[in-house]
């Protein structure tokens, strides 16, 4: 399966500590990104979540120079997508046995390729 999400990729933010409630929370930008990406994924894929082991390739496109400082680490970019796809494309990201992530300069989008292994 191949899905192109026309959304500017952002890395998953680190959980913050709330001293008032003594809890942890994700930054607002991470939550908004996840919700938008989930809506895109649900629109693009209406099947049941895949149940077997998976190989996933992710291509991240941003219109900025490719550096960790202004682009984010590829593992944090991938984690944001993998978490958003839980329960939509697959049951849980623990099913992924092979993962490839690539950063490119270009218009803001994410290309997701999922291969179900037997």
Model feature map: region roles:
Residues 1-118:
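Acidic, proline/glycine-enriched N-terminal capping motif
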């Amino acid at each position: 399966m191949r899905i192109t999400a026309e959304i500017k990729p952002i890395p998953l933010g680190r959980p913050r500590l709330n001293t008032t409630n003594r809890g942890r929370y994700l930054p607002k930008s991470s939550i908004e990104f996840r919700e938008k990406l989930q809506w895109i994924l649900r629109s693009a894929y209406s099947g049941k979540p895949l149940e077997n082991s998976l190989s996933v390739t992710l291509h991240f496109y941003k219109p900025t120079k490719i550096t960790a400082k202004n682009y984010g680490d590829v593992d944090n970019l991938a984690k944001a997508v993998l978490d958003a796809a839980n329960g939509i494309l697959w049951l849980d990201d623990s099913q992924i046995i092979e993962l490839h992530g690539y950063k490119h300069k270009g218009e803001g989008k994410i290309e997701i390729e999922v291969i179900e292994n037997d």
